[in-house]
Amino acid sequence: MTNVLLVALGGSIGAVFRYLISIFMIQVFGSSFPFGTLVVNVIGSFFMGVIYALGQMSHISPELKALIGVGLLGALTTFSTFSNETLLLLQEGDWLKAILNVVLNLSLCLFMVYLGQQLVFSRI
């Protein structure tokens, strides 16, 4: 039951962060490209790599994994919004932005998970 509450707490924090980051990105770059979703996915991917690496080396408790990995990062990142925004770009006929969105999300997020893991593994 404790882990469920930790996931809920982390999720509420992650959802608020996602909302604030998305609003900020729209204010800075406008809404013609889903930069907010890209940024939260990239940030979340980096920290997921860190959490995974720490977990592999038993330097993080199951409770902290639940709070940060499942709760906070699960709510911060969003595959469903990424998918919806990509589909909307396709429906609007903006194939270039849709393809760019897919390529950037996948390549940057994979790289950031790797970078987060390597940062931890190289320091310990």
From Swiss-Prot:
<dbReference type="GO" id="GO:0140114">
    <property type="term" value="P:cellular detoxification of fluoride"/>
</dbReference>
<protein>
    <recommendedName>
        <fullName>Fluoride-specific ion channel FluC</fullName>
    </recommendedName>
</protein>
<keyword id="KW-1003">Cell membrane</keyword>
<feature type="transmembrane region" description="Helical">
    <location>
        <begin position="4"/>
        <end position="24"/>
    </location>
</feature>
<keyword id="KW-1133">Transmembrane helix</keyword>
<keyword id="KW-0407">Ion channel</keyword>
<feature type="binding site">
    <location>
        <position position="77"/>
    </location>
    <ligand>
        <name>Na(+)</name>
    </ligand>
</feature>
<keyword id="KW-0406">Ion transport</keyword>
<keyword id="KW-0472">Membrane</keyword>
<keyword id="KW-0813">Transport</keyword>
<feature type="binding site">
    <location>
        <position position="74"/>
    </location>
    <ligand>
        <name>Na(+)</name>
    </ligand>
</feature>
<comment type="similarity">
    <text>Belongs to the fluoride channel Fluc/FEX (TC 1.A.43) family.</text>
</comment>
<keyword id="KW-0812">Transmembrane</keyword>
<feature type="transmembrane region" description="Helical">
    <location>
        <begin position="35"/>
        <end position="55"/>
    </location>
</feature>
<keyword id="KW-0915">Sodium</keyword>
<dbReference type="GO" id="GO:0046872">
    <property type="term" value="F:metal ion binding"/>
</dbReference>
<comment type="function">
    <text>Fluoride-specific ion channel. Important for reducing fluoride concentration in the cell, thus reducing its toxicity.</text>
</comment>
<dbReference type="Pfam" id="PF02537">
    <property type="entry name" value="CRCB"/>
</dbReference>
<feature type="transmembrane region" description="Helical">
    <location>
        <begin position="60"/>
        <end position="80"/>
    </location>
</feature>
<feature type="transmembrane region" description="Helical">
    <location>
        <begin position="95"/>
        <end position="115"/>
    </location>
</feature>
<keyword id="KW-0997">Cell inner membrane</keyword>
<dbReference type="GO" id="GO:0062054">
    <property type="term" value="F:fluoride channel activity"/>
</dbReference>
<keyword id="KW-0479">Metal-binding</keyword>
<dbReference type="GO" id="GO:0005886">
    <property type="term" value="C:plasma membrane"/>
</dbReference>
<dbReference type="InterPro" id="IPR003691">
    <property type="entry name" value="FluC"/>
</dbReference>
